[in-house]
Amino acid sequence: MSKTVWEKLNDSQKDELMQFNKEYIDFLSVSKTERAFVNNSIALVEKAGFKNLSEVTELKPGDKVYSTNKGKNILAFIIGKEPIRNGLNLLGAHIDSPRTDLKQHPLYESNGLVLLDTHYYGGIKKYQWVARPMALVGVVVKKDGTVIDINIGDDDNDPVVGISDLLIHLAADQMSKTGAKVVEGEALDVLVGSIPKKDTEKDPVKAYI
């Protein structure tokens, strides 16, 4: 009978593995978007001795440098001893950030509730995204070029938003569907408010927000 990797490790290796797993989980938890991943990766490579390529005037064998592309890609290099025409060793990875993105004008009111209109990105299982707390994470670029980082939901004291689901007593039709259809993409709108503004007739909840 085959053994798992865990069964083959000694106690010291198990401790090392658990520490690696914790650091990996912590990294993913704060790297929900490509931009966040790149920013956090910069901190890691700089800690490992890499320097920003734009700040280096001369390269020699053994130098460690990195470069980013529009804040959404990162390349890290260790300069070798031989000319690049002789080849290079390359490791590549895709920054995958499955998520629901806000549409251009997302805020709308329906049946006394205010929601954010979304479209999903990546190969997500849509039913996994309902009835759980979510964070609003991203970047806003103002007309004057000012960049504002947004992160609402990661801190325990932040407001909580989420995608609502049907109660089991109302979900007979839903439960008969396949996993791909049990929650449709158009149903992934985020609930953000239900308190109406006083003395407002049209879209009072939206007006309050």
What are these language model-derived features?
Residues 1-209:
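N-terminal hydrophobic/helix-forming segments and targeting peptides
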